[in-house]
Amino acid sequence: MTDLQKVDPEKYAAVADNFVYVHRALRRDLDRIIEGGEELFQSDFPRFARILEKHSELEDQLFFPALEERAPGVTRDSDDQHQQVETLVTDLATGKCNDTAKSLLQLRELLHSHLEEEEQKVMPAMMDHFEAAEIWALDGRIMEFCSPEFMQEMLPWWFEHIDAGDRVCVAQNMAVGVPEDFLPVLCQWIAAGLAESEWAELTEKVPALKIPTPS
């Protein structure tokens, strides 16, 4: 358990999806792409770029403006870093980098530094300046920014690139925060990214996910 979890487990759970579990998936997927060489870069980097872009958009348009109203200036460094990361990702995605492998390593260094800064500065500020219910309310607005097509791509990716413990935490949050009539759809998308045994393990620990029967 981290220090932030010990201080306020309820608030930590509310911010962790966007500032812990997505971050871990981004790190792991980028590491995988780097280790996989040119072929994997060509096939999988476009998806990584789309998901990272949307993640940054959600911060820039949803979470950061709300936080700036209560803690002016706290997200300034993250805003600047978003621009640096976006520029390098765009150059990689459009073939403008002369040395793809070297540029990917630069991206990893920049991205890791950026994510750590958010986890050490922005995430604690969210917990300091918002009640858990307010954070959940912001989280509940994510679908305003995400198309069903994006969510269908993102959810399998997310659950594939976090470990079993993180899957349980994210799934528990979804089981509570997602409308009951939409939960079966999300479950189908999540299951698409997992092996049958992994899905069985997850539904055993989060029974609410047993509503649908993935094929």
Q: What does each model-found stretch correspond to?
A:
Residues 1-215:
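Small-residue-biased structural context
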